[in-house]
Amino acid sequence: ILKNYLVDRLNGKKLGLSANGSSRRESYRFAPVARMSNTYIAPGSDDVEKMIASVDRGIYVKSINAGSVNSITGEFNFNTGETFLIEHGEITVPVHSATLIGTGGDILQKVEQVGKDYELGQGFCYAGSGAIYIGAGQPTVKVSEMTVGGDEIC
C-alpha cells in the first residue's frame, strides 16, 4: 500500500503535496533531493518452501548486486547476485548474470504471495545528490511474471 510520496518543499508545492522531510544529500557539496532512506515490504503469512513448490518455472533471487530506478517513470533494472532456477517446484541450478527489468507499480500489482521470512539490510543509493546510506528489507515475494534478461544458466 503506497502511503505517501517522497517530496521536498519545491516538488511538493508543484504537486500540491506537503513536504515530508525526504530530501537527502551526501554532503554540503550536493543540492538536496527527495530520496529514499528506509524502504521495506512487511512480512506476510506464506511459507517460503510452499511458495517455491508452487512455481513451475521461474527464478529464486536471494540477493541483488546493483541496479537503477528512473524516479520519474518507475522503470528499474536490477542485477541479481545469488540466483537459482526453479523447475517444477524445485530449486535446481545457479543462474549467472540475471537482470530484472520492469516498472515498480506494475510489479507491485503482480505480487501473488509474501513470505513470513524477513530480513533487513543496508546499502547505498547513488544519485545526483551523492551516495547515501539506506536501509531496506523484505521477505520472500512471489511475482506472477517479470522480464528477466541474462547471459546463461550455469
Question: What are the language-model segments listed below?
Answer:
Residues 1-154:
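N-terminal small-residue-enriched
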